């Protein structure tokens, strides 16, 4: 530890929409130091964190997955804490409804004004953003919730491709992206307050991983379709099955009956991407699936998705995903030994 005697107090916030796996994962890692004391010289002999689950009320709380957990204390009982962490929360298709947990957001804002870190895992930043502390500060969230977040909190700059964002004048706003990026969050907190060697020891014990490549490889591109421009929606529908044809942008313009400049302007305003960028994203998304599910060569996949120049395809793929095609395949393709073991079981189930 860095000369500190008293452990840091961590308040892990539980609301009914919370993800139990994320909440308990964070809890177990930060609270497990005492159990590992003496097993690794890199770990402190005194637990660096005191972790408790807090909520609107103490007692039993039923979560979104139907399971329950015990809330150790109500926020009314917590007058000071060093760290507020909100785990993943379920965000409905209709988006995040603000104002449901005003007592929690006011409490979190008060703790932050007293010096506490505000930390979120995945979609937990929806709740913390209601404090106003993230206004004008970079943050990240699960890519699947990025549109909902942008609509709910337009004053918060969003970077869903980033795993971890540390912001604020005193670096006291910490957000992590997609679900298991809570690994990066807890490892960062351990590095910051205990040390890098301790974080490495904890990572080894729990098999936690830093997401060094960011979240861009995990993002599934779907394209905005709720913009209300019927002409653009029609073009998107056609493009979804014809993105690999030669000159797809020119064909969309021809089919739309609009002037080229008008079509491109409306398409960009509606989707947030220029037509050629939209085509590229669809092609790369199809290439990702082919890399994951087939053994086709990178050159063959390049041709299949519409690129005659495999070298250009490789450069574009890395620019969009942050990874080379071969590295992406190694990361996401089901391991050969698993496929080999699963194949006989699939065949046996297919026999009537």
Positions of predicted regions on the chain:
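A short, Lys/Arg-enriched amphipathic alpha-helix from helix-turn-helix/homeodomain DNA-binding modules
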Residues: 215, 220-247, 253-256, 260, ...
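Conserved anion/nucleotide-ligand pocket segment
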Residues: 166-205
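Short, structured loop/turn "capping" segments at alpha-beta junctions
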Residues: 156-160, 196-201, 212-217, 245-247
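Short acidic/histidine-centered micro-motifs embedded in hydrophobic/aromatic stretches
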Residues: 202-209, 255
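Basic/polar phosphate-binding segments, predominantly the helix-turn-helix DNA-binding elements
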Residues: 240-241, 246-282, 302-327
């Amino acid at each position: 530890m860095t000369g500190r005697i008293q452990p840091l107090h961590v308040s892990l916030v539980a609301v009914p929409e919370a993800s139990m796996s994320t909440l308990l994962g964070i809890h177990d890692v930060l609270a497990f130091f005492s159990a590992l004391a003496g097993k690794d010289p890199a770990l402190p002999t005194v637990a660096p964190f005191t972790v408790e689950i807090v909520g609107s009320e103490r007692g039993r709380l039923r979560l979104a997955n139907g399971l329950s957990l015990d809330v150790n204390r109500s926020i009314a009982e917590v007058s000071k804490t060093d760290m507020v962490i909100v785990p993943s929360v379920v965000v409905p298709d209709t988006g995040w409804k603000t104002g449901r947990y005003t007592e929690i957001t006011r409490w979190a804002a008060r703790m932050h004004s007293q010096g506490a870190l505000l930390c979120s895992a995945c979609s937990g930043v929806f709740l913390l953003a209601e404090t106003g502390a993230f206004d004008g500060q970079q943050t990240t969230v699960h890519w699947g919730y990025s549109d909902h977040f942008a609509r709910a909190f337009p004053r918060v700059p969003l970077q869903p491709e980033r795993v971890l964002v540390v912001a604020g004048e005193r670096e006291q706003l910490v957000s992590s992206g997609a679900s298991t990026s809570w690994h990066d969050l807890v490892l960062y907190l351990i590095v910051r307050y205990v040390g890098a060697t301790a974080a490495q020891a904890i990572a080894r014990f729990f098999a936690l991983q830093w997401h060094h490549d960011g979240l861009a490889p995990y993002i599934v591109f779907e394209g905005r379709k709720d913009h209300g421009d019927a002409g653009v929606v029609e073009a998107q529908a056609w493009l979804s099955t014809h993105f690999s044809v030669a000159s797809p942008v020119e064909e969309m313009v021809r089919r739309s009956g609009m002037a080229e400049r008008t079509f491109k302007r409306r398409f960009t305003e509606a989707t947030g991407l220029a037509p050629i960028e939209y085509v590229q994203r669809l092609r790369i998304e199809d290439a990702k699936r082919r890399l994951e599910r087939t053994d086709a060569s990178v050159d063959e996949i390049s041709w299949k998705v519409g690129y005659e120049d495999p070298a250009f395809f490789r450069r574009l793929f890395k620019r969009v995903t942050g990874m080379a095609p071969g590295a992406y395949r190694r990361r996401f393709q089901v391991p050969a030994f698993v496929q080999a073991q699963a194949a006989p079981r699939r065949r046996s189930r297919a026999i009537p």
